[in-house]
Each structure stands twice: as C-alpha cells, then as structure tokens.
C-alpha cells in the first residue's frame, strides 16, 4: 500500500480501493485506518480511501502537537497530493470533528459529509469521562486501553487482533493530543456554514453521542438522520452492513 508525501518532511500511509466517487475516511484517536475494515467493501461502488493520520498507524510521526485544525489541513493537503478536488468525507466519532472542520473551513473540498457518532463539542458528562478515561489509560496502561477499544468494536477475534496491532503503532503523545483537542473543541457556532449534503448516523441510548443530534437538527436542517435503535457508538464495525448501505444510498442519491 502507498505512502504519499504531504510536504518535504511528512508522509502519510493510506489504502485505496475501487473507482468512481472518492470517499475519504477519517478515524478517531489511536485507531487508525483499520477501524474502517468493513468499509473496504464500498469499493464495489466508490473509490474508497483510508489514510492513517500522522502519528497513527503506518504514517510518519510529527514534531508538533496534533489538533483538529492540524489534521483538517493535513486531509486537505492529502487530497491535493492525490489530485482530488472534492470528495465525500466520512468522519467517525472524533474523526467527525476533523471532517466538520474541513466542511466549514474548506467547503470547496467537500461534496458530501457523512458522520457516524458525531458531536460538535463534548458537552455531556459521559463523553467528557470517556475522553478523560482514554487519556488516563493511555498514560497508565495503554495496553488495557487498546484491549478495551478493540473489544468494544468487534467480537471477531481476528479483527480485534488487527485493531490492536495497528493501535500499537500509534505515537502515544499524538494520540493523547488528539483526545485532548477533541475534548476542548467546539464548532457549534459554525454548524450553519455546513451547506453540503449531510448524513448523520447514530446508535440508540447506548451511543453517548446521540444527544448531540439536536445541535445538527437545529443548525443543519437539510441534513438526513438515521438512528439504529438498541445499538452503541461503534457502527462502522458492529453495524457495518447497515452503515455501508446508508453510505451507498445517500451518496448515489445526492450525486449530481
């Protein structure tokens, strides 16, 4: 799989499959591109692209602190390097913050915005505790954190091993910074600027992000929402068939 140069000092590793409308997948802290294991099947319909953000997986580490704005600029540069003028962005969990940031800072880059487990700010207690617990375990017992994350995403032993092995490659300082900046990030005031077609996917009561849907319903009235009752936060892996069907239908319906 290829490495691509973003600037003279940094290379990003990515996987790419299929042809047609490009969809770029943006992962949450630590997990890297492997969390989108099942979204590779979307290559039947689209050109699907899975980068490891810098400091994650097989991409280069960086000398400066990671942040939502930094990674948003990195994805825009990544698109330029691949000669992609505009793409569908799929952001999962905190990866959705990066996708949203690109959406209102570089709307010319985004044809559609698809967000699974999205939030514009971490305002509820559960979300705050999860972010702080992630940072604490990363400092005290990173192996346990990786085990928890892998286990919460799948019951499949092989995929759990794939996810864990990939998380071990992440630079823990940048993983921590990604958590920290996600915890402090707030783009609620910018949401009305997101005018591209948008799809939001949430789980049920076990998905801590679902309460954030109200922010988007008020500010992005053109957006579409889909809730999977009785499901948790980890839709790309645990409900991948429905997730992929929603992506396919949404993009093809709104493609001009």
UniProtKB/Swiss-Prot annotation:
Source species taxonomy: Bacteria, Bacillati, Bacillota, Bacilli, Bacillales
Q: What is this protein called?
A: AB hydrolase superfamily protein YvaM
Induction record: Repressed by RghR.
Q: Which SUPFAM superfamilies match?
A: alpha/beta-Hydrolases
Q: Which GO terms describe its molecular function?
A: hydrolase activity
Give the organism, scientific name.
Bacillus subtilis (strain 168)
Family affiliation? Belongs to the AB hydrolase superfamily.
Keywords assigned by UniProt? Hydrolase
EC numbers on record: 3.-.-.-
- Looking at the keywords, is Hydrolase present? yes
Keyword hit for Hydrolase:
yes
Q: Which GO terms describe its cellular component?
A: membrane
Q: Which residues form the AB hydrolase-1 domain?
A: 22-122
User: Which InterPro entries does this chain map to?
Assistant: AB_hydrolase_1, AB_hydrolase_fold, AB_hydrolase_sf
* Classification via Pfam families: Abhydrolase_1
């Amino acid at each position: 799989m290829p490495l691509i140069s973003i600037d003279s000092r940094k290379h990003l590793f990515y996987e790419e499959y299929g042809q047609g409308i490009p969809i770029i997948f943006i992962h949450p802290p630590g997990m890297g591109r492997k969390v989108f294991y099942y979204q590779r099947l979307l290559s039947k319909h689209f050109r699907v692209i899975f980068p490891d953000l810098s400091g994650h997986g097989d991409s280069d580490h960086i000398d400066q602190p990671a942040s939502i704005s930094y990674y948003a600029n990195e994805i825009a540069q990544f698109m330029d390097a691949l000669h992609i003028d505009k793409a569908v962005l799929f952001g999962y969990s905190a990866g959705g913050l990066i996708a949203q940031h690109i959406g209102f800072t570089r709307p010319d880059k985004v044809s559609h915005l698809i967000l699974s487990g999205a939030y514009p700010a971490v305002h509820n207690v559960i979300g705050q505790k999860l972010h702080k617990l992630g940072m604490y375990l990363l400092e005290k017992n990173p192996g346990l954190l990786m085990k928890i994350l892998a286990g919460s995403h799948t019951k499949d032993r092989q995929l759990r091993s794939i996810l864990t092995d990939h998380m071990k490659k992440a630079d823990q300082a940048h993983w921590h910074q990604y958590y920290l900046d996600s915890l402090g990030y707030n783009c609620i005031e910018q949401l009305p600027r997101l005018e591209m077609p948008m799809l939001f996917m949430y789980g049920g009561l076990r998905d801590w992000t679902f309460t954030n849907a109200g922010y988007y319903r008020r500010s992005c009235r053109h957006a579409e929402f889909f809730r999977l009752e009785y499901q948790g936060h980890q839709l790309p892996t645990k409900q991948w068939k429905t997730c992929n069907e929603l992506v396919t239908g949404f993009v093809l319906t709104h493609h001009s």
